[in-house]
């Protein structure tokens, strides 16, 4: 299997939250595609945050794309100069006021690798505590919700988690918990 070769690139739309690029590419068999579009986004993060008593820190907010209100994981954009972990910690503190805990990377996923160029880093923050107030962006209106494990699992089973980049790490969390699997990077003695 060979990669495509990019012959030309041109930005056709460039805004703070969305950039569209048109590439002229050569496929491995020599065919040319003059118009292949890539959506460029910054790196994203999301956080499965649990309090010391085992409740999950979730955010409830309106999502204009689907014109509805959803309960989701805390998530956001990694700012320039930040690592994904730093961005995830900042987003959790800004959106919820929760901080601290033991952090581990759960997975790195792509929303659609055929037409987007970014990755989402999904973290587990275990043992977070309320230490401050929310510091929301101008377009954010977020309610913090604390859910039990069974309430969160029920949301997944009822298909209430519409954001695939949030559902995937949650399904993985529950799968690993239920099959006594290791978290990536854990030693054999650090099983859940």
Give the predicted meaning of each segment:
Residues 8-46, 52:
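Acidic, metal-coordinating catalytic segment for phosphate/diphosphate chemistry
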Residues 42-72:
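A glycine-rich, hydrophobic loop/mini-helix early in the fold
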Residues 153-192:
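Long hydrophobic alpha-helical segments typical of transmembrane helices together
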């Amino acid at each position: 299997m060979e990669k495509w070769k990019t012959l030309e690139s041109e930005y056709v739309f460039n805004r703070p939250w969305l950039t569209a690029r048109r590439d002229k590419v050569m496929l491995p068999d020599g065919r040319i595609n003059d118009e292949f579009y890539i959506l460029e986004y910054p790196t994203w993060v999301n956080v499965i945050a649990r309090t010391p008593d085992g409740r999950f820190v979730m955010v409830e907010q309106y999502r204009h794309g689907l014109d509805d209100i959803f309960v989701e994981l805390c998530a956001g954009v990694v700012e320039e100069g930040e690592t994904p972990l730093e961005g995830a910690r900042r987003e959790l503190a800004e959106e919820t006021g929760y901080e601290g805990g033991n952090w581990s990377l759960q997975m790195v996923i792509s929303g659609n690798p055929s037409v987007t160029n970014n990755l989402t880093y999904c973290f587990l923050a275990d043992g977070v505590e309320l230490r401050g107030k929310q510091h929301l962006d101008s377009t954010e209106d977020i309610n913090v919700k604390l859910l039990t494990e069974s309430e969160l699992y029920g949301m997944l089973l009822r298909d209430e988690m519409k954001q695939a980049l949030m559902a995937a790490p949650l399904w993985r969390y529950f799968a690993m918990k239920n099959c006594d699997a290791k978290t990536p990077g854990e030693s054999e003695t650090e099983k859940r």
